[in-house]
Each structure stands twice: as C-alpha cells, then as structure tokens.
Curated annotation (Swiss-Prot):
The name this protein goes by in its record: Protein PAT1 homolog 1
Sequence segments annotated as region (Region N): 85-388
Subunit structure and binding partners: Interacts (via region A) with DDX6/RCK. Interacts (via region H and region C) with LSM1 and LSM4. Interacts (via region N) with DCP1A, DCP2, EDC3, EDC4 and XRN1. Interacts with the CCR4-NOT complex. Interacts with the Lsm-containing SMN-Sm protein complex. Interacts with EIF4ENIF1/4E-T.
Sequence ranges of Basic and acidic residues compositional bias: 385-400
Biological process terms in GO annotation: deadenylation-dependent decapping of nuclear-transcribed mRNA; P-body assembly
Residues modified as Asymmetric dimethylarginine: R217, R223, R263, R284
Keyword line: Cytoplasm, Methylation, Nucleus, Phosphoprotein, RNA-binding
Region (Involved in RNA-binding): 223-397
Region: Region C, residue numbers: 449-770
Organism in which the protein naturally occurs: Pongo abelii
Region described as Region A: spans on this chain: 1-84
Region of interest (Region H), residue spans: 389-448
Length: 770
C-alpha cells in the first residue's frame, strides 16, 4: 500500500529540524500537562522505560558473546536477519476472516515475487537505532528497544508459506506505542486514574512495551453535547483523543474519531467518484498510518473503503436530512471485519464534541439528532417506543421562553383582550361574526328537520355583557392659559403651569365685552351684505333670461337690495337723519369689508357713492393706520376715480377740503396739519389727492360759466393745497400709484415761478422715483 520510488521518499526520513520542532512540541505538551494535572502526573516515565529496556539489552545472549573486532558487523547482520523476519511477520498481519475471502486470496496469489536484499534492509526504515535516533533526536537515543524485544512482543501467527514471497513494498509499518507517528495528532495526557480502553495484551508484553502506562486512552466523549455549564473550553478540546486509528483496531462499541483534516481528505476523495476512493488517496490520510487498514491490499481497499464514504459527493451539511435507514444492496463479498463495519456505520455521524458550537446551535443539533434517532427506531421497530416517544415529546414541549411573565401580568393582558369583547350592541360592533353564526344555526336547524343526523354542537364565542360607562374627557382649564399646557399627562410629562389671574375692574371687562360684541356684529353685517351683493350681481343674468313682463319686478328687487347694501354699509337707522361714520369705519377696518366696498360702489347711485367717498376722506388717516398690515385700500382707487368723473365741482371742492382737513379761510394761519401729513405719506392718500386736484382743474377750465363764488372757493383751496405741498419735506412724500399729466399747468396759475420750479422738482422726483 505504501509505495515509494526510493527509500529516501519515505515520510519517516526527514530533516532533523522538523523533528527538533516535534521535540519542542512535546515539551510544550508536558508543560500543559503539568499545569493541568500537577507536576507529578507524567514525570520520569520515559526514564524508567529506558532503564528497563537497557537491562533487557544486557541480558541478550547475542550481546554477551560478540567480540570487539567483527562483533559490530556480525551484530548488524543479526539485526538485519531479525528485521527481515519482523517485516515478513508484519506483512502477514491480516485478519483471519479477511484471508478467507476469495477475492483477497486471488489478489495475494497474483503478486510478483520480489527477493529482499539484506543491504537495502540495513539502510531502510527497518534500521533500529540510527533511523529512530534521527526521528526522535537525542531524547530517545537510548530508549528504542531492540528487534528481539519487538519480535517477542508481536502476537504469534501461524506460518504461511505462499505469503513469504510478497512484495516488500506492501508491508505495513509496525505499530508503535511510545514514539509518535508523523502526520498523526499528538497523544494527549488524561487525568490519572482513567481506565484504559485498549485491546487485551499479555501482561508480560505490556510490561516490556510500556511498564507503567502513562498515556492511556480516556473514555470516549458522549455522543450528544453536555449541558452548557459542563462543556469543554477550547484548550480542553485539544486534549480529546483523536488517534483511534493509530495502531489499534476499532472495537465495535467505540466509534472512530477522525480529525477535521482526515475527514476532509476522506470526503474530498469521494468527490472524484461518488462512493469510491483510490488506494493512493486513501494512503495519504495520516490517521491510517500503522493501522490494520494499511496492511490490506490496494484492490481490497478500493472495493472496501468506498463503502465507508457517503454516496453523494462533497460534504453533507450539519442539519441536512438523516442518512437512509436501509443500506443499498452490496455487490461484493462480506466485509473485512467488525472494525471496518463500525467505521462504515459511524463515519457519517457528526461528533458535536470536536467543534465548539454556540449553545443555541448545540441545542438545535441535539433536537435534530434526537428526531433522526427516533425515526430510525420507528423504522427498525426496536426499543420501548411508547416510553421513548413520550419522553421525546415531553422534551420538545419544553418552551425555553416559558415563565417569562408573572400571573398578574398575564391576567392584565387577558383583561385588556376581554375589554375589546365587551359590547352592548354586538350586531353593530361584531356584525360579520353575528351574521356568520346565524347562518350556521339556520343550517343546523335545517339538518335537524331533515333528520340527517344528530345536531352538531357548535362552539360560540360568549362575550361578557358589561354595561359601558360613557366617559367624556374634560381637560382641566385655567383662566389665562390659552395655548399653554395646563396639565401633565403621559404624552406631555411637564410641570403644570402657574395660572396667572389678573384682577380687572368691571368697567374694563364691560368695555372688552362691548368691543368683542361689536366686532362680531360687524362680521355678521359683512356676511349679510355679501349675500346681497351676490344676488345683485346675479340679477344681470336673470334679467337677460327673464321675459319682458318680469323685468320691472326684477329691477325693483334689484334696487331694493342695493339700498339694503347701502344701509348695511352706513348703518343708518330708521328716523336718523345722518348716520355716524363709526359703523362704516368698523367695516373698513376688516379686510373683507374693504374688498366688499370696492365691489359695491359701481352698483350704488351717485349720491350714495359720493357719501361713501366723503366718509372715507374724512376718516382716511385712521383707515390708513388700520390698513398698514393688509394694504387693501389701493383697490378702492379705481372705483373712486370713476366716481369723480360724475361728481360736480362743488362736491369735488368739498371732498378736497375733507381730504386735506383745510381751514375754512386761507387767511387764517394754518397750524401743523397731521391729517394732511398722514395722507401725503400714504400712496393711496397722495394718489387720491392728485386725482381730485386734476379733476377739479379740468372742471374749472372746461366750464367758464361757473359762478364766481365757486371759483373763489376753488382758488382758496388750491392756494392752501399748494402751501402744504411746499411745506412737506421731500423725503416725507410717498410714491403715488398714478400721477395726472396736468399738474404743472395747474400749479402755474396759483404760485410764482420759483415755487412752481420747487413743486415741479418735487413732482418730477416723485415721478422719477415711481
């Protein structure tokens, strides 16, 4: 089986540096043993073995009779003869039941005959002292037993003549109990007192080979993982015995333990041909060196070893399906022996003690292996099925997440779930279930009437009839805390605010209430007036669609609604001659009211519209102040401009006096006029003033037949307006919306050239700014 091109290719013949590294590894292992089991666990065993072997060498008759001259050469010849016999006996170590196999006998008989040469044996791997000295170094220089001792220790086999002529290259290496084999895992020490699990050896042979057994085989680890508290550490995992294939046949009760490298090599060879492996690939597995498998024929290994491998190529996952319970039919003679049968049956089994898995992974693997084992038991029909099944089910029923909640917490969750089932009106809260159960009851009643069979009792959900208490949430409110958080809750875990109560007099409360009520009334009036405005705007469409006889009535309704709108704007009460401006000002202070007035002005009569314009001119500074944020007043400029073209000169003069708040006579010295200043600093007020001046000048120039009194009045108004414009600083003037074109000619008739240039500069500057 072990074929090499030359003796130099033998794996035992390596350099001294590699074996020196092995010696250092042995020293580290001894140090680990001392740290683990004490300093006296494995001390001095090799020395005692050396002394006993030295005594045996002295008692040998060959060593006593040899002389100093030719004694060394004769001793080497004698050792060569003994080693030749030893090699022949080792090559015959085949199990009896394997020799009875016809296939094996045919393979043995067809071997060519090779004559061994003593010279090659003396320098081969069978050399006793020198070869082993290169392997172990100075540590075993005087420890190796002689050939006679090894020969005496071998079990006696009956002589077989035809087998003596077999090829020497097929002879297996002898088993070694004291020196490690290259490629095999190192022998680990175990606690003292562990009973050895080895084959029975004669007491005398055992005393010769190992007088005091030091490295004994520990008990095999359990098939399934131990509890989490008893699992081994990574250092302890290294001490698991993994050399059961080294020089010992497999007992039927002990499954073989393969290292991950050996398992990978075995399974890797199966990828080439499913279920088969060549003898050369099998020979490279380091765990089989020196085992009984090494002495077998390569053809026999090719037929036998393939059965130990799984039929599918590649590795099988940890949690894959279990192997088939019934083995496939075999097309070959009976197997070699119980140790290979045991290897074949146990090789695919995963050993959880060879890897360090996560506790959760171990638990899942343990459950999967128990399920596989129960399936095999059910298929084979062996064992107490009832007890094993019940115990397995009890084990699976154990919930690792049980007892995580107290009984009080469970009751609390149950109450929450029951609260959802409480209903005073189940047809409303649980409509679909109630209808479904009614259909089931009707079906059961129909079956009972037909007599098909006994009535089936159906389970019905019984909801507790508990009266619901309607609870309306009323948050705590404090005076003066509008928009602030008043209470602390789960969603708002803040400190309650200190409600600040300000003491106010009754007059202040009454006045505030009046203002609030007045604003509400104003809003109501605006909404009513808007409704009238929409109806009036719709009358044009209704007028076009109506008949001739219906149109007068529509016109009357329209006039009536227009008067109602004017009354709502002015707030004129029955029997009151002149309404107050306060009501109109309240409407104009609201943005919606300003826009509504701009839409209503075209529908009003000239007198009504002039009254609205006059009221606006009188209260323009106050309206400008209220419109500072909205700036909606410019929307009134267009309807006011259209209105001015329908007003007479007297009305325009009066409007100009109201707008500028001028005194009755120009001769009186005019004090400071804040009213006019506010109008000139607003774009709507300045634009309205310029439009009035332009329209008045047009009327004066176009109608020369006007009375002199009106002309004098207009002239005085123009002088006062020009004086105010000259007094207002240039920076205080606002940007008007529109500037008439006839302003320069207008002022040229009332002021001299110097003042005219100054006004022209201001107006041009204003026009340029615009």
């Amino acid at each position: 089986m072990f074929r090499y091109e030359s003796l130099e290719d033998c794996p035992l013949d390596e350099d001294e540096d590699a074996f020196q590294g092995l010696g250092e590894e042995d020293e580290e292992i001894d140090q680990f043993n001392d740290d683990t089991f004490g300093s006296g666990a494995v001390d001095d065993d090799w020395q005692e073995a050396h002394e006993r072997l030295a005594e045996l060498e002295e008692k040998l008759p060959v060593a006593v009779n040899e002389q100093t001259g030719n004694g060394e050469r004769d001793e080497m010849d004698l050792l060569g003869d003994h080693e030749e016999n030893l090699a022949e006996r080792l090559s015959k170590m085949v199990i009896e039941n394997e020799l009875e196999d016809p296939a094996i006998m045919r393979a043995v008989q067809t071997r060519p005959v090779l004559q061994p040469q003593p010279g090659s044996l003396n320098s081969s791997i069978w050399d006793g002292s020198e070869a082993l000295r290169r392997i172990r170094g100075p540590l075993l220089a005087q420890e190796m037993p002689t050939v006679s001792v090894l020969e005496y220790a071998l079990p006696q086999r009956p002589p077989q003549g035809p087998e003596d002529d077999r090829d020497l290259s097929e002879r297996a290496l002898p088993r070694r109990s004291t020196s490690p084999i290259i490629g095999s895992p190192p022998v680990r020490a175990v606690p003292i007192g562990t009973p050895p699990k080895q084959m029975a050896v004669p007491s005398f042979t055992q005393q010769i080979l190992c007088p005091k057994p030091v490295h004994v085989r520990p008990p095999m680890p359990p098939r399934y993982p131990a509890p989490y508290g008893e699992r081994m550490s990574p250092n302890q995992l290294c001490s698991v015995p993994n050399s059961s294939l080294l020089g010992h046949p497999f007992p039927p009760s002990v499954p073989p333990v393969l290292s991950p490298l050996q398992r990978a090599q075995l399974l890797g060879g199966a990828q080439l041909q499913p279920g088969r492996m060549s003898p050369s690939q099998f020979a490279r597995v380091p765990g089989f060196v020196g085992s009984p498998l090494a002495a077998m024929n390569p053809k026999l290994l090719q037929g036998r070893v393939g059965q130990m491998l799984p039929p599918a190529p590649g590795f099988r996952a940890f949690f894959s399906a279990p192997p088939s319970a019934t083995p496939p039919p075999q097309q070959h003679p009976p197997g070699p022996g119980p140790h290979l049968q045991n290897l074949r049956s146990q090789a695919p089994m995963f050993r959880p003690d060879t890897t360090h898995l996560h506790p959760q992974h171990r638990r899942l693997l343990h459950q999967r292996q128990q399920q596989n084992r129960n399936q095999h038991r059910n298929l084979n029909g062996a064992g107490d099925r009832g007890s094993h099944r019940s115990s397995h089910q009890d084990h699976l029923r154990k919930d690792p997440y049980a007892n995580l909640m107290l009984q009080r917490e469970k009751d609390w969750v149950s109450k929450i779930q029951m609260m959802q089932l409480q209903s005073t009106d189940p047809y409303l809260d649980d409509f679909y279930y109630q209808n479904y159960f009614e259909k089931l009851e009707k079906l059961s009643a129909a079956e009972e009437i037909q007599g098909d069979g006994p009535k089936k009792e159906r389970t019905k959900l019984i909801t507790p009839q508990v009266a619901k208490l309607e609870h309306t949430y009323k948050p705590v409110q404090f005076e003066g805390s509008l928009g602030k958080l008043t209470v602390s809750s789960v969603n708002n875990p803040r400190k309650m605010i200190d409600a600040v109560v300000t003491s106010r007099s009754e007059d202040d409360e009454t006045k505030e209430k009046q203002v609030r009520d007045k604003r509400r009334k104003t809003l109501v009036i605006i909404e009513k007036t808007y409704s009238l405005l929409l109806d009036v705007e719709d009358y044009e469409r209704r007028y076009l669609l109506s008949l001739e006889e219906e149109r007068p009535a529509l016109m009357d309704e329209r006039k009536h609604k227009i008067c109602s709108m004017y009354d709502n704007l002015r707030g004129k009460l029955p029997g009151q001659e002149r309404p107050s401006d306060d009501h109109f000002v309240q409407i104009m202070c609201i943005r919606k009211g300003k826009r509504m007035v701009a839409r209503i002005l075209p529908f009003l009569s000239t007198e009504q519209a002039a009254d609205i314009l006059m009221t606006t001119a009188r209260n323009l500074p106050f309206l400008i102040k209220k419109d500072a944020q909205d700036e909606v007043l410019p929307c009134l400029l267009s309807p006011f401009s259209l209105l001015l073209y329908h007003l007479p000169s007297v009305t325009i003069t009066s409007l100009l006096q109201q707008l500028m708040n001028l005194p009755q006579s120009a001769a009186t010295p005019a004090p400071s006029n804040p009213h006019l200043t506010a109008v000139l600093q607003n774009k709507f007020g300045l634009s309205l003033l310029l439009i009035l001046l332009s329209r008045g000048e047009d009327l004066q120039s176009s109608d020369p037949a006007t009375e002199s009194t009106q002309n004098n009045q207009w002239t005085e108004v123009m002088f006062m307006a020009t004086r105010e414009l000259l007094r207002i600083p240039q920076a205080a003037l606002a940007k008007p919306i529109s500037i008439p074109t006839n302003l320069v000619s207008l002022f040229s008739r009332y002021v001299d050239r110097q003042k005219l240039n100054l006004l022209e500069t201001k107006l041009q500057l204003v026009q340029g700014i615009r």
